[in-house]
Design a protein with these regions (language model features):
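NAD(P)+-binding Rossmann beta1-loop-alpha1 motif at the extreme N-terminus of oxidoreductases
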Residues: 1-55
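Phosphate-coordination loops involved in phosphoryl transfer and adenosine-cofactor binding
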Residues: 2-4, 87, 128
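Short phosphate-binding/catalytic loops that engage adenosine nucleotides
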Residues: 26-27, 107, 153, 193
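Short, hydrophobic beta-strand segments that form beta-sheet elements in well-ordered domains
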Residues: 29-33, 90-94, 112, 131-133, ...
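Rossmann-like NAD(P)(H) cofactor-binding subdomain of soluble oxidoreductases
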Residues: 36, 44-123
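Internal alpha-helical scaffold of NAD(P)-dependent oxidoreductase catalytic cores
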Residues: 38-45, 123-168, 173-210, 254, ...
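Interdomain hinge/lid region at the active-site interface
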Residues: 189, 203-262
Length: 262
């Protein structure tokens, strides 16, 4: 059973996940971050010690949970292996990292991917967050599954391809949509209008999706009406904002292509 966990990282995912694991009864026996101050801040909230040195981490952890940027995962695992040996168990939290890369450093590795957007100061209802896991052995897969079920009511074992597909879809559904909100906000601010005016619209669109509507079935707007007059007027109004104009034009073409493909 996974009881002693070392958190590698101190960002949004490491913070939220570390706190949830701590609340669930896991013993967090150390926090590592490349920035000592950040390691100490997170460690204090988890009643453990923080460090920026791998040599100061405990070597008897049941799990080294790696929540760092993708480009740093391999380096971190290589250093953990050098410090504690080939037999440690480590799992990363990435949606797209190729787990097989870790096989050259450690015997057993896994994935603990939470499909949610995290910020340190916003505490989500973790029971509703989908958690996707995988591991290089059935034993560790079961261990991660048991750990995940203490946090979430939606735990699934998936393969690497499925995880990457989920990550791509999540980027579209969350990251890209949020960027579009940012674009909308900037356009409004430049014209002395408040972004809050769009909140009822955003809530209604979100409500329909949450309640089970097919996104394609509730699509509205000038693109699917083929209202070329309005589209051209909008594009002209965005002449002084070429980047936003490009986004508008590209998304409009995508909408029309998808809606009228049949």
């Amino acid at each position: 059973m996974i009881k002693k966990i070392t958190i590698i990282g101190s960002g949004n995912v490491a913070t939220i996940l570390g706190k949830e694991l701590f609340r669930s009864g896991c013993s967090i026996n150390g926090v590592w971050s490349r920035t000592l101050k950040n390691a100490m801040i997170l460690a204090e909230s988890l009643q453990t010690s923080g460090t920026d040195k791998f040599s100061e981490l405990p070597g008897d952890s049941d799990l080294y949970l790696i929540a760092v940027i993708d480009d740093a995962i391999e380096t971190v695992v290589a250093q953990l292996s050098q410090q504690f040996g080939y037999r440690i168990f480590a799992a990363h939290t990435s949606g797209s990292f190729r787990t097989e890369v870790l096989g050259q450093y450690i015997q057993n590795s896994g994935v603990f991917y939470c499909l949610q957007t995290f910020t340190k100061n916003s505490v989500p209802d973790f029971r509703n967050i989908p958690v996707f896991i995988s591991a290089t052995s059935t034993f560790y897969e079961n261990e991660l599954q048991n750990m995940a079920q203490n946090l979430s009511d939606c735990v699934k074992v998936i393969d690497e391809h499925q995880r990457k597909v989920l990550h791509i879809a999540a980027v579209f559904a969350n990251n890209f949509v949020n960027h579009i909100y940012t674009v909308s906000q900037e356009i409004l601010l430049q014209n002395n209008l408040d972004f809050k005016l769009l909140i009822p619209l955003i809530k209604e669109s979100s409500r329909k999706i949450i309640e089970g509507s097919n996104p394609a079935d509730i699509q509205t707007g000038p693109a699917i009406r083929r209202d070329s007059t309005i589209i051209e007027e909008h594009l002209k109004m965005l002449d002084d904002l070429p980047h936003f104009r490009e986004i508008y034009n590209s998304v409009t073409k995508s909408l029309m292509s998808h809606h009228f493909k049949n």
